[in-house]
Amino acid sequence: KSLYKPTISSMEGSKKGNNKFLLHNNLSEKGFPVFDTILASSLNDIPACIATLRNKGYKKAVVKSQIGASGIGITSLPTVPDGPISIPEHFFFEGPCMVQGWLDETVKNVRHMGSPSIQMFLDERTLSLYDITEQILNKDCVHEGNLSPPLYFSKNDWVFKELFRQATASGSWLHEQGYRGTASVDFLVVEHCGNIEVRVCEINARITGATYPSIIARHFLPHDAWLMRNIRFAKPLKDRSLLKILDQAG
């Protein structure tokens, strides 16, 4: 407002587009594979949700607020609690939370394959899917970078086609909410009982850590690979010091 410049997306479009619960419902209604999900209207509902997921064979569960980003509004819990369950009150600000089964090697016959993400841009008339990346995550699933392309499938594989099929559906839904701009769809790919399964985790209707490196790489190296890592220094560095280190390293 201070610059007297209009935004390309409405506030309502941004809010709806970042709502994980609305996206989950849309994908489920259209028959796409989704995570086992139970709604919790308050903290008192969480133990019963956790118990249900434990009976389904899950060792961990994740509690998601309807809107959140970069680790805000999401927390994981063991399905066998070792103490009282504590969830911040703001998790319920937008309405019921989603309590979902956590798919990884702790679940019988499941092997984690990867966490790909498809980058997209939405304008008034079109949805453009312009890159596919692999998220680099630490042991707590915190984002530490991206690489492209992912190493465990190629363009001719079923996984590649399924990722774009689900990304197209998710992006079309996002467009219907009125969102315009850059976005990405995050996925989980697992092997379950010998079959590969692809599920949408969430849509990030915003600029993400992969947006700029992806756009730059696709502009200058449209058919090549790229890698971006987030680095945190033990002591803060000034920009000149950082550039000097990079110059010295060649």
What are these regions (language model features)?
Residues 1-48, 52:
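Conserved N-proximal alpha/beta basic substrate-recognition cap immediately N-terminal to
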Residues 33-35, 56-62, 78-111, 173:
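Conserved ATP-binding module of the ATP-grasp superfamily
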Residues 34-37, 60-86, 140-154:
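Glycine-rich phosphate-binding loop of ATP-grasp-fold ATP-dependent ligases
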Residues 79-81, 121-127, 190-194:
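Short acidic-glycine loop/turn motifs at beta-strand connectors
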Residues 93-94, 101-106, 142-197, 234-250:
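A long amphipathic alpha-helix within ATP-dependent nucleotide-binding catalytic cores
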Residues 111-154:
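Membrane-embedded hairpin module used as a gating/binding unit in multi-pass transport
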Residues 137-138, 200-214:
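Glycine-rich phosphate/pyrophosphate-binding beta-alpha loops
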Residues 212-224:
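A short alpha/beta connector and helix-capping loop motif
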